[in-house]
């Protein structure tokens, strides 16, 4: 018998190597995903803060609330961070809730 193919031992070794690679890779992907969502939220807050400033410049320094920014098209309605946190505007400052 001179059949070519993988033995059971060879298949087990391959499965072990793949499992180890997955154990190393998955936690890193999760960690980077959380970091990306946090930075995305920070960027969105900065954008909303810039829109608050633009509104104030257009309206003689009046501090807007969220409804005013949404109704005049400065920001989209129901704007949320990538991680699901809502954007809150208080005293002219944007922050994640």
Swiss-Prot record:
Instruction: Output the Gene Ontology cellular-component terms.
Output: cell surface; plasma membrane; type II protein secretion system complex
Note the InterPro entries from the entry.
Bac_GSPG_pilin (IPR000983), ComGC (IPR016940), N_methyl_site (IPR012902), Pilin-like (IPR045584)
Q: Where does it localize?
A: Cell membrane; Cell surface
Keyword check for Disulfide bond: yes
Instruction: Please tell me whether the keyword Cell membrane is annotated for this protein.
Output: yes
Q: Which residues form the propeptide?
A: 1-5
Residue ranges annotated as transmembrane are: 6-26
What is one process in the GO biological process aspect for this record? Answer: protein secretion by the type II secretion system
Assembly with partners or alone: Homodimer.
* Purpose of the protein: Required for transformation and DNA binding.
- Which named protein is this? ComG operon protein 3 homolog
Where does this protein come from, organism-wise? Bacillus licheniformis (strain ATCC 14580 / DSM 13 / JCM 2505 / CCUG 7422 / NBRC 12200 / NCIMB 9375 / NCTC 10341 / NRRL NRS-1264 / Gibson 46)
Q: What is the lineage of its organism?
A: Bacteria, Bacillati, Bacillota, Bacilli, Bacillales
């Amino acid at each position: 018998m001179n059949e070519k193919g993988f033995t059971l031992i060879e298949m087990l070794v391959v499965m072990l190597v793949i499992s180890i690679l997955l154990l190393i890779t998955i936690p890193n992907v999760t960690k980077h995903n959380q970091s990306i969502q946090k930075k995305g939220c920070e960027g969105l807050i900065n954008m909303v803060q810039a829109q608050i400033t633009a509104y104030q410049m257009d309206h003689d320094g009046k501090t807007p609330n969220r409804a005013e920014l949404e109704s005049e098209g400065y920001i989209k309605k129901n704007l949320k961070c990538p991680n699901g946190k809502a954007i809150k505007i208080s005293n002219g400052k944007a922050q994640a809730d």
